Each structure stands twice: as C-alpha cells, then as structure tokens.
Amino acid sequence: GTACSCGNSKGIYWFYRPSCPTDRGYTGSCRYFLGTCCTPAD
C-alpha cells in the first residue's frame, strides 16, 4: 500500500475500502485518495 499520515497516526492506504480490516486501526479519511488510512503501516 501507499504510506499515509492522517490525523496523528501513520499508516497505509487501503484503496476503495469504506473501512479498515478488522485487525487494523483507523487513522482517518484522506480526501485526496480514494481509500482509508489504516495502521499499522507495514
């Protein structure tokens, strides 16, 4: 995935997903990408 930093956390983008996977934390919505930013960033 692509690295992202939304809010106070860093993570990776999950494109075209309305929400993060259950084992991932939600950092925030980045308007300039079609996806959500989820942690951890691996």
UniProtKB/Swiss-Prot annotation:
Keyword Electron transport assigned: no
Superkingdom: Eukaryota
Cellular compartments annotated: Secreted; Nematocyst
Keywords of this entry: Disulfide bond, Ion channel impairing toxin, Nematocyst, Neurotoxin, Pharmaceutical, Potassium channel impairing toxin, Proton-gated sodium channel impairing toxin, Secreted, Toxin, Voltage-gated potassium channel impairing toxin, Voltage-gated sodium channel impairing toxin
Stated consequence of mutating S5A: 2.5-fold decrease in ability to inhibit rASIC3
Region (Play an important role in the folding and structural integrity of APETx2): 13-14
Database matches in SUPFAM superfamilies: Defensin-like
GO cellular component term, pick one: extracellular region
One GO MF term attached to the UniProt entry: potassium channel regulator activity
Site (described: Probably important in ability to inhibit ASIC3): R24
Annotated site residues (Important in ability to inhibit Kv11.1/KCNH2/ERG1) in this chain: N8, P18
InterPro entries per UniProt: BDS_K_chnl_tox, Myo_ane_neurotoxin_sf
Record annotation: effect of changing F33A: Complete loss of ability to inhibit rASIC3 and hKv11.1/KCNH2/ERG1 (tail current only)
Residues of the site described as Important in ability to inhibit ASIC3: G1, T2, F15, Y16, R17
Annotated site, Important in ability to inhibit both ASIC3 and Kv11.1/KCNH2/ERG1, chain positions: F33, L34
Keyword Secreted: yes
Result of altering R17A: 44-fold decrease in ability to inhibit rASIC3 and mASIC3
Family: Belongs to the sea anemone type 3 (BDS) potassium channel toxin family.
Additional note from the record: Negative results: does not block rat ASIC1a and ASIC1b (ASIC1 isoforms), ASIC2a (ASIC2 isoform), and the heteromeric ASIC2a-ASIC3 channels. In addition, does not inhibit most of voltage-gated potassium channels tested (Kv1.4, Kv2.2, Kv3.1, Kv4.1, Kv4.2, Kv4.3). Does not inhibit Nav1.3, Nav1.4, Nav1.5 and Nav1.7. Shows a very weak inhibition on Nav1.6 (17% inhibition by 1 uM of the toxin).
Cited function: This toxin potently blocks acid-sensing ion channel ASIC3 homotrimers and heterotrimers containing ASIC3 (composed with isoforms of ASIC1 and ASIC2). It also weakly inhibits potassium channels, and sodium channels. On homomeric ASIC3, this protein shows IC(50)=57-87 nM on rat, 37.3 nM on mouse and 175 nM on human channels. The blockade is rapid and reversible. On heterotrimeric forms, the toxin is less potent (IC(50)=117 nM on rat ASIC2b-ASIC3 channel, 900 nM on rat ASIC1b-ASIC3, and 2 uM on rat ASIC1a-ASIC3).
Protein name from the UniProt record: Pi-actitoxin-Ael2b
Species in which this protein is naturally found: Anthopleura elegantissima
